[in-house]
């Protein structure tokens, strides 16, 4: 533990020393549109809102996926303890743009402070949280040590540690530091048994590790604007006479795989349409531009372009926050982030919740536990492929056989409902036991 304290002091001194350079870096990111244009000072702990009186819980999620996983817990907390103030922080602008419309009324949002001593002290000094709930794997030393010093209970929900991160934290230099950091948590809720074992191997106290299920299974009915709902209904009408499949969460390079499969499918299914949903809107615009340059007919969602039957067979989505609704227009969902080595998969449960037949590649990394759990429950709930030809054959089988398609759809929906049941209840019991009734400056009781 002494070595861990020594390594932390080195880290603290380093982050203090490079703070001016970090400040310049954030300003540069702001000019590039990577930080919020007017709210970027929040990254240095400068608040843009007044702290309400009373108890406050801080939920932190770095990006969109983690943020959406936190929302069901935040909603439950807001319902059972309406007099409690909830603060949510995210790091990325894209996460903020989507999540701001999903948070319950009264929940505050700020951009997360950088892990520098001044930013963390400034942030904690203003907001004075009674408990801090961190999503997944944000182990920031200055934040954790400062919170511990103020006797603020810390919880890590949906805790995960990738193989790469585990190897890095296990190094002789960093193991003492991560052991020190994990010892400060009152609750670590891993998203799988394997993840729990990894945290134990990093010397997390066994009594704080409690498995409750993967929050990414809990896909509640999030708020959708009336305009979005209407446009989705219009899209369903346009696609009514076509064979539709959707390829979502695509990383750069994966569109080549999807378009190659689509071109092969057109030979046997000339009335088929593929909906392409890249992770970033700008990537979608680039895909559409390239396809048009090659002479292909493409409809771009942000421009409200219509599909022409037997002519337009590629629909590119270059908008944010609509994926759950878009799954409802396609019976087959191919989940990206899984077709190129080095990628680590994406959430399958959103498509399963919508009743899609789910297909994914073999590079699923962070979501390997989800693929395994779903396939163990019912092998038809997820089809995993390794090559472009296997993907083509899997989609072709479903497009050609309505009965087989319906069986796969029902399997994914049933497995989702089974795996998602009681997760929020279990999480809430753990939070109430380990966090809200734990040792802190101000006792919180949430029933």
From Swiss-Prot:
It catalyses: lipid IVA (E. coli) + CMP-3-deoxy-beta-D-manno-octulosonate = alpha-Kdo-(2->6)-lipid IVA (E. coli) + CMP + H(+); alpha-Kdo-(2->6)-lipid IVA (E. coli) + CMP-3-deoxy-beta-D-manno-octulosonate = alpha-Kdo-(2->4)-alpha-Kdo-(2->6)-lipid IVA (E. coli) + CMP + H(+). It is found in: Mitochondrion. Disruption phenotype: No visible phenotype under normal growth conditions, but plants lacking KDTA accumulate high levels of tetraacyldisaccharide 1,4'-bis-phosphate (lipid IVA). One of its GO terms (biological process) is Kdo2-lipid A biosynthetic process. GO terms for molecular function: Kdo transferase activity. CMP binds at residues 278-279, 320-322, 347-350. Expressed in leaves, stems and flowers. Residues 1-32 form a transit peptide. GO terms for cellular component: membrane; mitochondrion. Keywords: Glycosyltransferase, Lipid A biosynthesis, Lipid biosynthesis, Lipid metabolism, Mitochondrion, Transferase, Transit peptide. The record marks 136, 216 as: Transition state stabilizer. It is an enzyme of class 2 (transferase). InterPro entries: Glycos_transf_N (IPR007507), Glycos_transf_N_sf (IPR038107), Kdotransferase (IPR039901). Its EC number is 2.4.99.12, 2.4.99.13. The active site is at 66 (proton acceptor). The keyword Acyltransferase does not apply. Belongs to the glycosyltransferase group 1 family. Glycosyltransferase 30 subfamily. Involved in the biosynthesis of lipid A, a phosphorylated glycolipid that in bacteria anchors the lipopolysaccharide to the outer membrane of the cell. Catalyzes the transfer of two 3-deoxy-D-manno-octulosonate (Kdo) residues from CMP-Kdo to lipid IV(A), the tetraacyldisaccharide-1,4'-bisphosphate precursor of lipid A. Lipid A-like molecules in plants may serve as structural components of the outer membranes of mitochondria and/or chloroplasts, or may be involved in signal transduction or plant defense responses. This is Probable 3-deoxy-D-manno-octulosonic acid transferase, mitochondrial. The gene is KDTA.
């Amino acid at each position: 533990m002494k070595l861990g304290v020594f390594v932390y002091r080195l880290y603290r001194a380093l982050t203090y020393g490079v703070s001016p350079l970090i400040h310049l870096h954030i300003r540069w990111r702001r000019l590039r549109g990577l930080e919020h244009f007017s709210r970027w000072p929040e990254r240095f702990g400068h608040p843009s809102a007044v702290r309400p009186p009373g108890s406050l819980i801080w939920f932190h999620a770095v990006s969109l996926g983690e943020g959406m996983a936190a929302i069901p817990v935040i909603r439950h907390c807001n319902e059972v303890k309406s007099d409690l103030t909830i603060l949510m922080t995210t790091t990325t602008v894209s996460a903020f743009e989507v999540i701001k419309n999903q948070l319950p009324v009264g929940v505050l949002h700020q951009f997360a402070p950088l892990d520098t001593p001044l930013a963390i002290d400034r942030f904690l000094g203003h907001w004075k949280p009674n408990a801090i709930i961190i999503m997944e794997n944000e182990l920031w030393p200055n934040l954790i040590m400062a919170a511990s010093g103020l006797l603020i209970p810390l919880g890590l929900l949906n805790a995960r540690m990738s193989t790469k991160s585990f190897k890095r934290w296990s190094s002789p230099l960093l193991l003492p530091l991560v052991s020190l950091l994990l010892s400060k948590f009152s609750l670590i809720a891993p998203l799988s048994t394997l993840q729990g074992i990894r945290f134990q191997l990093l010397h997390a106290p066994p009594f704080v590790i409690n498995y409750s299920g993967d929050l990414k299974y809990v896909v509640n009915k999030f708020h959708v604007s009336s305009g979005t709902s209407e446009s989705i209904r219009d899209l369903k009408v346009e696609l009514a006479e076509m064979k539709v499949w959707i390829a979502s969460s695509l990383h750069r390079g994966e569109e080549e795989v999807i378009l190659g499969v689509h071109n092969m499918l057109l030979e046997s299914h000339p009335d088929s349409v593929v909906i392409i949903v890249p992770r970033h809107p700008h990537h979608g615009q680039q895909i559409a531009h390239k396809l048009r340059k090659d002479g292909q007919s493409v409809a771009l969602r942000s421009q409200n372009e219509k599909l022409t039957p037997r002519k337009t067979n590629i629909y590119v989505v270059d908008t944010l926050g609509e994926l759950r609704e878009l799954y409802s227009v396609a019976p087959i969902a191919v989940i990206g982030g899984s077709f190129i080595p080095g990628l680590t998969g994406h959430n399958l449960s959103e498509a399963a919740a919508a009743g899609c037949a789910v297909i994914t590649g073999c590079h699923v990394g962070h979501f390997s536990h989800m693929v395994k759990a779903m396939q163990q429950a019912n092998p038809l709930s997820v089809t995993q492929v390794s090559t472009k030809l296997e993907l083509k054959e899997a989609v072709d089988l479903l497009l050609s056989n309505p009965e087989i398609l319906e069986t796969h759809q029902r399997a994914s929906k049933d497995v989702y409902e089974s795996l998602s049941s009681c997760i929020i209840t279990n999480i809430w019991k753990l939070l109430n036991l380990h966090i809200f009734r734990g040792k802190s400056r101000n006792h919180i009781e949430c029933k």
